[in-house]
Curated annotation (Swiss-Prot):
Expressed at low levels in roots, leaves, inflorescence and, to a lower extent, in siliques. This is Spliceosome-associated protein 130 A. Residues 817-848 are annotated as: Disordered. It comes from the Eukaryota. One of its GO terms (molecular function) is nucleic acid binding. It comes from Arabidopsis thaliana.
Length: 1214
């Protein structure tokens, strides 16, 4: 079995982010690392975040830093990764790629303790970079320029110190003196030698300055000073002419200014009034904003509070350090302050935010200062504050993030054409159920009812130079309605259009004339109001029409074509007639090329299943140039001019290709390339769009031509980042559409469906899925589907939080203390997770501020029944008494009295530290009442461990409780034990069943295949895995095969050999006698590993599903970082050979950007086996054209054929 691995949605979580001028000029961009992906983002003029470039590096990005050489105009990016190499990247604006400027090897690959890459720090003047490991090793590279002004890099200079842990690293701004780097370090050499543990408890962190002597080319430890043992982060303080130099040390509860030869200046970080005394305050991210006359720091704590830190200094001497409350935003892994007045927050969990500065915190607020620091017997006097609504910042955009994706199921609850992906995401108050649909999201601008069922709609401008459309023209079966576009859309009668007949086409002709084609003729309306009519000869009528701005072709009944052109005066002149062999099914004329008077090509679709290209040149007018046979009669034709598939912003610098798109009556879109010179057709591709014949329309998206295909659902064909995408729109079925442009909606679409006129616009391009968000209360853990009622049951739990009632009581208390009424200036009983907007009236929205923190051993949990069709919670049971839900399943017991029941595994008083401990475990049994919309507790059964896995099995309940697999039956007051097996190695975390087989996943020992013998009432293991895997997800594939994922980012399949499987099924004891003997301290039989692949991210859920109507199934997976991928089985040996060779050539010709070897990356823990990396193969279109041809020649193909194979492989999955 060979599989094709493809990422459907890239990771959405962000590990780290930096900002700078990477493209040169004044524009500021943000470079973000999403695990194995490097993205370049830029806020547009509307304050929306746009992705400029995205690249898969096939390695783990651990750290990023930017630097600029003195006098240069753009920034470079230094990447610390798991490749054992330092890589310096430069963004190439013309080609829209990252160019690798330097790559220097210094150590082994992989994320290791002593191999640098975890920390990267640069000298603020761009003269040197230090790359550090968690322990021991630090290397310094000197950066310079050669005679041609290109960046050069020196050999590495070592700054190693053994037995030393590094916590943070940063450059020190010392102007143009020798570069200095600062590190927080801890020497553990004594602690290592002392068995009593006293030296470990006395170990002291130090702040160490490393100086690079540019004259001697040598690094030395210049200064080391003890620092607070809670120190975790360093921030560079501007130096030279801009400030006092030195560093800010962020420690638990404190911010300390430190510099060589300067006394420490310390201020406490203000803490929330409701924070338990046992909890400290740690800084998790920081940013500095520097202007010519001043600078300040923004630091964010682990609770999301942002503080403004300022230094009062005179020259190099700092007299006071102030920490003032600024605002509260969700906790971020990185924050970036842009010069345009934006703050980008890369959230740890949930959506990322772009904020605009309203003010910079000059108004009085809660402030702590080094000058009023008070020391008491318990320590320093804390300063308290109460979070408030945003005052200095306002959120203007957010980027969706699924991180962390906790559970995922592919279901078609809404009975749509394609299934939906239901995913549990987020953490705490930012948790959500997200319903993902393949396709682009749209924003509906207006819907209005029409007096009847319209058949078509067009928009027209009055003049070619107009920016916006003037009229919407709607055709009915016996009339035409004209609406003018202004402040209001209203009907007009003086437009010159004939309104007593249906219309076949409405368009602008020439520079300022309008044309209406109706069954009996052509109406030409001049700018001055004069109207010219052309009537059809005899009793024949016009059936089809094709047109552009200067040319019109009509097809009369019987198959006669008549060709018109607009002359110099704007008058329509008949040029040529041509008799076709039969009726014409559809027509289209190619757009007029820039600077030309006419287009050369006319496409004609006939009912004999052919499409012909005819010439419109005066020399050979209406002569057939080429013929294409298609699988069904064409319904609609569209010429689309698109740019080449590589290049700068959307390939703008490359010559256009002309594509002919045909919508066929069997629901297929047929796409073929038209030779711009000869009109010959080549490189055809087809894709099934839906059950209705696709109608094709040309619209404008981001200023470029795009194609709207209306089948049983709408599709959009468009260019994004140099590639052509054909993606469904998440909208209802439409009948007819036209581009729409007004001052309120510059790039919209007007469409008709049923008796309604709809205007909408397309949101973000390039997305695979769009999402509907349903907020949840606590961190979701797992969910199940009620099979008959189509309701979802979700279990949620959080550690160290208060229940909803306790939070409500505390909130009221807080309002009363603040002198506000019970509802504050909003509503205290506002929806449970504070809605999605900071603008809501609630001054303490949980979504923004997080939940108040409780003691770490306190748990809150709830069971939610949710109707996904209405997104409403029909039942919410909050668990009491410190219980947390861990597992859930639906179960039908032999006793049919209650029907489908719900089993929930919970644990009371769970503690992980200092050692794992719990009071008791329970299995709750609930019955569904009120049509499944509510739950009623039948009983709960106490068990001795944590029930992490539950599963129905032959009318009973299987439970994994610690290392015990137990079978329960339903009793009146509790569950009744029927049978158990205690021989599992550690902890059971998953159970799946098929017939009489049970597939058990152990937390650290992979899969165990079990059987239940009903006659002996015994559970026994007949096969297990010989590789100890730390399971995070599992799925049953077939009778002998299981798919699993481990916590190191691998996906693997194991299969019981066919002969063993048959032997066990035929054996009257079912392998039981062999089991009693055992083998290698385990089961008598071992499963074979048949598939192995390193995804590079921890997979949390696996499922077998098909995303395409009637398509074959794939294994879908979701990861912690929020990416969604699929593994699809090849059906032919030819495909395996082709993609294997393509992958081999891509490895050779396109080495990963950050220096990791692709083969080694995909085999990071176990050698890759029988999986082809589709993500690498899909980099093929980004290669230069000569390289594409070289690879294609070696594969005996053309580049177009390879692109077609890649497109087909993706279309089989989604």
């Amino acid at each position: 079995m060979y599989l094709y691995s493809l990422t459907l949605q890239q990771a959405t979580g962000i590990v780290c982010a930096i900002n700078g001028n990477f493209s040169g000029g004044k524009t500021q961009e943000i470079a973000v690392a999403r695990g194995k992906i490097l993205d370049l983002l830029r806020p547009d003029e509307n304050g929306k975040i746009q992705t400029i470039h995205s690249v898969e590096v096939f390695g783990a990005i651990r750290s990023l830093a930017q630097f600029r050489l003195t006098g240069a105009q753009k920034d470079y990016i230094v990447v610390g990764s798991d490749s054992g190499r330092i890589v310096i990247l430069e963004y190439n604006k013309e080609k829209n790629v990252f160019d690798k400027v330097h790559q220097e090897t210094f150590g082994k690959s992989g994320c290791r303790r002593i191999v640098p890459g975890q920390y990267v720090a640069v000298d603020p003047k761009g003269r040197a970079v230090m790359i550090g490991a968690c322990e021991k090793q630090k290397l310094v590279y000197v950066l310079n320029r050669d005679t041609t002004a290109r960046l050069t890099i020196s050999s590495p200079l070592e700054a190693h110190k053994s037995h030393t842990i590094c916590y943070s690293l940063c450059g020190v701004d010392c102007g143009f003196d020798n570069p200095i780097f600062a590190a927080i370090e801890l020497d553990y050499s004594e602690a290592d030698q002392d068995p009593t543990g006293q030296a470990a408890s006395e170990a002291q962190k130090h702040l160490t300055f490393y100086e690079l002597d540019l004259g001697l080319n040598h690094v030395s430890r210049k200064w080391s000073n003890p620092v607070d043992n809670g120190a975790n982060m360093l921030v560079t303080v501007p130096g030279g002419a801009d400030g006092p130099s030195g560093v800010l040390v962020c420690a638990e509860n404190f911010v300390i200014y430190m510099n060589q030869g300067h006394p420490d200046v310390r201020a406490v970080i203000p803490r929330r009034t409701d924070l338990p005394a046992e909890r400290g305050v740690l800084v998790v991210s920081a940013a500095v904003h520097k202007q010519k006359t001043m600078f300040f720091f923004l630091i964010q704590t682990e609770y999301g509070d942002v503080f403004k830190v300022t230094l009062d200094h005179n020259g190099d001497h700092v007299s006071e350090l102030k920490v003032k409350y600024f605002d509260t935003i969700p906790v971020a892994s990185s924050i970036c302050v842009l010069k345009l007045g934006f703050l980008f927050s890369a959230s740890e969990f949930g959506n990322h935010g772009l904020y605009q500065f309203q003010a910079i915190g000059e108004e009085p607020d809660v402030e702590s200062s080094s000058s009023n620091l008070m020391e008491t017997e318990e320590g320093f006097q804390p300063v308290f504050f109460q979070p408030r609504r945003l005052k200095n910042l306002v959120r203007i955009d957010q980027v969706e993030s699924l991180m962390p994706l906790m559970d995922m199921k592919v279901l078609n609850i809404f009975e749509e054409e394609t299934p939906q992906i239901f995913s549990l995401c987020g953490r705490g108050p930012r948790s959500s159920l997200r319903i993902l649909r393949p396709g682009l999201a749209i924003t509906e601008m207006a819907v209005s009812q029409l007096p009847g069922q319209p058949s078509a709609v067009w928009t027209v401008k009055k003049n070619v130079s107009d920016e916006f459309d003037a009229y919407i023209v709607v055709s009915f079966t016996n009339a035409t309605l004209v609406l003018s576009i202004g402040e209001q859309v209203e009907e007009v009668n003086d437009s010159g259009f004939l309104d007593t007949t249906p219309s076949l086409a409405v368009s602008l002709i020439g520079d300022d004339s309008l044309m209406q084609v109706h069954p009996n003729g052509i109406r030409h309306i001049r700018e001055d109001g004069r109207i010219n009519e052309w009537r059809t000869p005899g009793k024949r009528s016009i059936v089809k029409v094709g047109y552009n701005r200067l040319q019109v072709v009509i097809a009369l009944s019987g198959g006669e074509l008549i060709y018109f052109e607009a002359d110099m005066t704007g008058q329509l002149m008949e040029v040529e007639k041509h008799e076709m062999s039969g009726d014409v099914a559809c027509l289209d004329i190619a757009p007029v090329p820039e600077g030309r008077k006419r287009s050369r090509f006319l496409a004609v679709g006939s009912y004999d299943n052919t499409v012909r290209i005819l010439s419109l040149d005066p020399d050979d007018c209406l002569q057939i140039l080429s013929v294409q046979s298609v699988s069904s009669a064409p319904e609609s034709l569209l010429f689309l001019e698109v740019q080449a598939s590589i290049g700068g912003d959307d390939g703008a610098d490359h010559p256009a290709n002309l594509f002919l798109n045909s919508g066929l009556q069997n629901g297929v879109l047929f796409r073929t390339v038209v030779d711009m010179v000869t009109g010959q057709l080549s490189d055809s591709r087809s894709r099934f769009l839906g059950l209705k014949p696709p109608k094709l329309f040309s619209i404008s998206v981001r200023g470029r031509s795009a194609m709207l295909c209306l089948s049983s659902r709408p599709w959009l064909g468009y260019i994004h980042r140099g590639h052509f995408h054909l993606t469904p729109l998440s909208y209802e079925t439409l009948e007819f559409a036209a581009p729409f442009s007004s001052d309120q909606c510059a790039e919209g679409v007007v469409s008709v469906a049923g008796d309604a006129l709809r205007i909408f616009m397309i949101d973000r391009l390039g997305e695979t899925f769009n999402e509907t968000v349903v907020p949840l209360r606590y961190t979701p853990r797992k969910f199940v589907l009620h099979p008959k009622r189509k309701l979802l049951v979700i279990i949620e739990s959080d550690q160290g939080a208060f229940t909803a009632e306790e939070r409500e009581a505390a909130r009221k208390e807080c309002f009363e203390a603040g002198g506000v009424g019970e509802n504050g200036n909003g509503n205290a009983d506002q929806m449970e997770n504070g809605a999605d907007d900071e603008d809501k009236e609630d001054p303490l929205s949980d979504e923004q501020y997080g939940y108040p923190k409780a003691e770490s051993e306190k748990w809150v949990s709830c069971i939610r029944v949710l109707d996904p069709k209405t997104a409403t919670t029909t039942c919410l049971l909050e668990l009491q008494d410190n219980e947390a839900a861990y597992s859930v399943c639906t179960v039908n017991f032999h006793d049919k009295e209650y029907g489908t029941l719900l089993a929930v595994g919970t644990v009371k008083g769970m503690q992980f530290w200092p050692k794992k401990n719990l009071v008791a475990g329970f299995i709750h049994i609930y019955r569904f009442v009120e049509d499944g919309k509510s739950l009623e507790l039948l009983h709960k059964t106490q068990v001795e461990g944590v029930p992490l896995a539950l599963c129905q099995f032959q009318g009973r309940l299987l439970a994994g409780i610690g290392p015990v697999l137990r079978l329960y039956d339903l009793g009146k007051k509790r569950l009744l034990r029927k049978c158990e097996n205690k021989l599992f190695p550690n902890t059971i975390i998953s159970i799946q069943t098929y017939r009489d087989r049970i597939y058990v996943g152990d937390i650290q020992e992979s899969f165990h295949y079990c059987k239940y013998r009903r006659d002996e009432n015994q559970l026994y293991i007949f096969a297990d895995d010989c590789v100890p895997r730390w399971l995070t997800a599992s799925h049953h594939v077939d009778f002998d095969t299981m798919a699993g994922a481990d916590k190191f980012g691998n996906v693997y399949f194991v299969r019981l050999p066919q002969d063993l499987s048959e032997e066990i099924e035929e054996d009257p004891t079912g392998g039981k006698i062999k089991w009693e003997q055992g083998k290698l301290n385990g089961a008598p039989n071992k499963v074979d590993e048949i598939v192995q692949f390193h995804v590079g991210d921890v997979v949390t859920c696996l499922q077998k599903a098909s995303m395409i109507p009637g398509g074959s199934e794939s294994i879908m997976y979701g990861t912690v970082m929020g990416s969604i991928g699929a593994l699809h089985a090849f059906t032919s040996r030819d495909d395996v050979d082709f993609f294997s060779h393509l992958e081999m050539h891509m490895r050779q010709e396109y080495p990963p950007l950050c220096g990791r070897d692709h083969m080694a990356y995909r085999s990071a823990y176990f050698p890759v086996k029988d999986v082809i990396d589709g993500d690498l193969c899909e980099q093929f279109p980004t290669l230069p054209m000569d390289l594409q041809r070289k690879i294609a020649d070696e594969l005996d193909r053309t580049p177009a054929e390879i692109l077609k194979k890649l497109e087909d492989a993706r279309n089989k999955i989604i």
